[in-house]
Amino acid sequence: MSELIVNVINGPNLGRLGRREPAVYGGTTHDELVALIEREAAELGLKAVVRQSDSEAQLLDWIHQAADAAEPVILNAGGLTHTSVALRDACAELSAPLIEVHISNVHAREEFRRHSYLSPIATGVIVGLGIQGYLLALRYLAEHVGT
């Protein structure tokens, strides 16, 4: 059996990890996060395809590709979580699991961050555990979707 491909998609501003609000998002850069995710995925027998874009259109394209391939998605949509019906509709097409991840505890922050268009259609939501949230999502997928 071939290894399961997991799409890890990061939205707007996540390319600035380590520089943007490190007190909220931590000091790990996006490049360091990618290496960590790829290493963890390999140890779990998964192949992580990690992407980041500040463009909503690009995120939609990647979600559509995952939907067409029936591949799971770990998604940190950043601020689009709270605003994008288009992203929600694209994610609704996924037949494989969707895990919504947020580095910070969005429920302990501003009121507008507490609403997610994605949570009602996600398989699971991991918030406030820092970058460990991505690794927990990978472990879940390895165990429940599996290799």
Swiss-Prot record:
Pfam families: DHquinase_II
GO biological process: amino acid biosynthetic process; aromatic amino acid family biosynthetic process; chorismate biosynthetic process; quinate catabolic process
Molecular function in Gene Ontology: 3-dehydroquinate dehydratase activity
Sequence positions that bind substrate: N76, H82, D89, I103, S104, R113
Recorded catalytic activity of this chain's protein: 3-dehydroquinate = 3-dehydroshikimate + H2O
EC number: 4.2.1.10
Enzyme class: lyase
Annotated site (Transition state stabilizer): R20
Gene Ontology terms: cellular component: cytosol
Pathway: Metabolic intermediate biosynthesis; chorismate biosynthesis; chorismate from D-erythrose 4-phosphate and phosphoenolpyruvate: step 3/7
Active site: Y25 (proton acceptor), H102 (proton donor)
InterPro entries to which the protein is assigned, alphabetical: DHquinase_II (IPR001874), DHquinase_II_CS (IPR018509), DHquinase_II_sf (IPR036441)
Superkingdom classification of source: Bacteria
Keywords from the named record: Amino-acid biosynthesis, Aromatic amino acid biosynthesis, Lyase
NCBIfam families attached to this UniProt entry: aroQ (TIGR01088), PRK05395.1-2 (NF003805), PRK05395.1-3 (NF003806), PRK05395.1-4 (NF003807)
Other facts noted in the record for this chain: Was identified as a high-confidence drug target.
Family per similarity comment: Belongs to the type-II 3-dehydroquinase family.
Role this protein plays: Catalyzes a trans-dehydration via an enolate intermediate.
Subunit (UniProt): Homododecamer.
HAMAP family: AroQ
Protein name: 3-dehydroquinate dehydratase
Source organism: Mycobacterium tuberculosis (strain ATCC 25618 / H37Rv)
